[in-house]
Amino acid sequence: MSDQAKNGIVDIPSNHSVDATVEKLKGILNSKGVMLFALVDHSGEAAKAGLKMPPTKLLIFGSPKAGTPVMLAAPSIAIDLPLKILVWQDANGKVWISSNSPQYLKERHNVPDDLIKNIAAVEALATAAAS
């Protein structure tokens, strides 16, 4: 079993900086009519507290039209929705796009097969932003 399969996180390398990757993601979400609920700048908040960390930003996004049927069928998934994508820079300067694996969420919350498509687009979003 791969590390990704064990922890449910998919990591995709980005060809861009954290800020450029975040901007690409915001543009993709906007073009698809997906709502960006919040953008958390972890590294910016760390700096305000006098601490240093590599650039790290979390996008929280979703579509009530897509997510609500999933939550009705599997209420515990509400702890993992809205969907999240983490864009972060590792100690070597490489930028990554990380998200929960839809398959992991399916298994974790027993999401019916016919509804997993409602949240599976997260991987395509991350892949599009990485290139």
Task: Report residues per predicted region.
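Well-ordered alpha/beta subsegment
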Residues: 107-131
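Terminal, regulation- and interaction-focused segments at domain boundaries
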Residues: 1-33
